[in-house]
Amino acid sequence: GVDKQNYSLWGSSAGARVVANISANGAKAYGGKTGIRPRAVVMAYTGHAGYSENDAPTFSIVGANDYIGDPEVMRRRAQKMKGLGIPVAFNVVAGLGHGFGLGTGTKAEGWIDEAVRFWEKQME
């Protein structure tokens, strides 16, 4: 089963917006039955700018050449969240655009492992 105290939410592009909103507002705001928030959120290549003091610790990654998920929007969001004391890991990968997936064979290769380490750190 899923560890309800230590789960994480992952999303890419529009899916990253979904997990960010669930993190900020709680699952109940979207018809969920639990108020238990994720231990971490992992967001890949999204232009989501919203944030709140309720956001879970967040790992985010984007390609420097992303024309959809603007890296600067993601950078500003990460800085604002850090200012609220929320743990954040923000990564920009040179030479990549939108939709690099697992990063296999690209400069982003290994980002999934980095995200898992970030999540594990939040469970300590």
Model-predicted regions and their roles:
Residues G1-D55:
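Primarily recognizes the serine-hydrolase "nucleophile elbow" in alpha/beta-hydrolase
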Residues D3, D66, H98:
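Acidic active-site catalytic centers that drive phospho-/nucleotidyl reactions
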Residues S8-G11, G15-A16, G63, G95, ...:
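Glycine-centered flexibility sites
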Residues L9, G50-Y51, I68, F100, ...:
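A broad, structure-centric signal for solvent-exposed, well-ordered loop/edge residues
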Residues A20, P71-R75, E109:
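Short, surface-exposed alpha-helical segments at coil->helix boundaries
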Residues A24, R75-A78, V116, E120:
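A structural alpha-helix within SAM-dependent methyltransferase catalytic domains
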Residues G32-V92:
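The feature captures the conserved acid-bearing segment of alpha/beta-hydrolase catalytic domains
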Residues I61, K82-E124:
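C-terminal catalytic histidine-bearing segment of alpha/beta-hydrolase fold enzymes
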